[in-house]
């Protein structure tokens, strides 16, 4: 407890975990590993996904066009049936992200990409300086956020080492996470050519460690604890009063921003909760899934007739 403050213990009949994919996984792995919640499914951390993403950017030489002005994402397109690309802008002053950029390289092998990096650097040493120049970076840069709806995933598990307890991830050998998406590099090069800028990748490219803005999964729905972490009503298997309601319950690479899917799943899960004092319409765990109609609240937060009124059908 920080600053010597007294520890407080809170009790609740129902507990919702909604800390975001990474932190929810971290908390639950801690609880399982320390035997506080030992019956959490062994599948915890499996089917974690990165939305099969690539982050590339085109950096212009000046701020004749201020790319920081406007909505963060204004459009998108699909270069093929599985790939979705969005031009993204950062607000003025958001320049720290630029330090993760580096000289753009191509290839499915990290060794090959490192060779390309050195070759490009020796051919034009000033290229690295221009890539790492983060002055007014957000005003000079267009990010190409690339996402794919392919079936790739990683497993996130706890590990103890000299550095203590931490989480580590491994690629699935049969469904490996994408480390190189050619369309992403092609698009950002075209943006750079159009505006006289420099295309850039990120430092993870050099070690086959893709970055993602949308880490999801790891606490997925299953028919039992042998196939998933939660049931179809978002109750943790073997702990039916513990609920997970965030991005960690997403079960696939969506290929788009997952925020609306996370919201839809959360709304569905909580719409099936009973009103206080009423009988729970959800079946007891292990009795199988059944379709349930949403439960109308007795005392809705938004009054009847007001804008944003909840309608249950």
Model-flagged regions — what are they?
Residues 198-206, 279-288:
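Short, glycine/acidic-rich hinge or "gate" loops at secondary-structure transitions
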Residues 17-18, 132, 174-178, 256:
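Hydrophobic alpha-helical scaffolding
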Residues 41-166, 215, 237, 247, ...:
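FAD cofactor-binding and catalytic pocket of flavoenzymes
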Residues 25-27, 67, 155-156, 229-231, ...:
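Short helix/loop capping segments that flank catalytic or ligand/cofactor-binding pockets
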Residues 4-6, 44, 130-134, 142-143, ...:
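Generic recognition of flexible, low-complexity loop/linker segments
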Residues 7, 12, 70-72, 139-143, ...:
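Active-site lining segments that contact anionic ligands and/or coordinate catalytic metals
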